[in-house]
C-alpha cells in the first residue's frame, strides 16, 4: 500500500484483485464473501484513488469502467451502476480482475494449471468450479453476463487473475483480453480503433 501512495496518482484507474483483499495471503483462509472483503475495504479505499466497487472514466470518448469482480461474482448495486454508465451512450471497455469466463478461457486456464501430462489429454471443456461455477450459478452474475453479451456499446473487456495470457471473442461487439501477471513478465498492448 505504501507503493500505491508513493507511485500512483489521482488519475489511476483499476480493479483490485484477491491479493489486495486478502489480509495475510494464505496465512488465513479467504472466505470469498463481501463480509471478508469488507475487512480490508476501508484501508484499501483510503489508498486507491478510485471507487473500489465500480469506477468510470471517459478517455478520448471511451468509457473505461472498472468493476470489482474479485471473487467471480457481481452484486445488484454494481449492475445498476453499470447500466447507468451504458446510458451515457459511449463505447465501453470493462476492466475487471476476474474475467467473465467463456468456455475457451476456462479451458485455457484449466489446461495451464493442470499437471504437464494432463494438458494435452483432451480438448473437452473441464467441469465448472470456482469462479466459473459461481458465474454460472449466481443469478445476478449470470444475468449480468447475459446482458453484457447483448450490450452493443461494450467494445472490450480487460482482466487478469488467471496468470495466463489469452483472448477470446466475448460478444459480437467485444473481445476479452486476459493478461498474466507482471511477475511472469506478461503484458499486452491493446489498441482500440
Region annotations inferred by a language model:
Residues 1-91, 115-121, 150-153, 167-192:
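Extended active-site neighborhood of metal-dependent phosphoesterases/phosphodiesterases
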Residues 17-18, 97, 160-161:
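Active-site glycine-centered loops adjacent to acidic/histidine catalytic or metal-binding residues
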Residues 71-73, 99-103, 164:
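Short, catalytically relevant binding-site loops at active-site mouths
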Residues 91-153:
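Active-site-proximal segments of metal-dependent phosphoesterases and phosphodiesterases across multiple
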Amino acid at each position: 500500500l505504501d507503493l500505491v501512495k508513493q507511485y500512483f496518482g489521482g488519475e489511476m484507474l483499476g480493479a483490485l484483485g484477491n491479493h489486495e483483499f486478502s489480509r495475510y495471503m494464505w496465512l488465513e483462509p479467504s472466505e470469498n464473501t463481501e463480509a471478508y472483503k469488507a475487512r480490508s475495504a476501508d484501508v484499501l479505499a483510503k489508498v486507491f484513488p478510485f471507487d473500489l466497487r465500480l469506477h468510470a472514466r471517459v478517455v478520448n470518448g471511451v468509457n473505461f469502467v472498472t468493476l470489482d469482480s474479485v471473487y467471480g461474482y457481481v452484486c445488484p448495486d454494481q449492475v445498476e451502476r453499470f447500466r447507468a454508465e451504458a446510458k451515457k451512450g459511449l463505447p465501453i471497455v470493462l476492466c475487471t480482475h476476474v474475467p467473465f469466463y467463456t468456455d475457451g478461457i476456462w479451458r485455457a486456464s484449466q489446461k495451464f494449471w493442470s499437471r504437464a501430462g494432463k494438458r494435452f489429454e483432451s480438448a473437452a471443456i473441464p467441469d465448472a468450479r470456482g469462479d466459473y461455477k459461481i458465474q454460472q450459478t449466481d443469478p445476478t452474475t449470470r444475468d449480468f453476463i447475459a446482458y453484457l453479451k447483448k450490450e452493443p456499446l461494450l467494445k472490450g473487456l480487460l482482466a487478469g487473475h488467471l496468470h495466463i495470457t489469452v483472448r477470446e471473442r466475448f460478444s459480437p461487439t467485444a473481445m476479452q483480453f486476459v493478461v498474466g501477471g507482471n511477475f511472469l513478465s506478461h503484458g499486452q498492448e491493446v489498441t482500440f480503433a
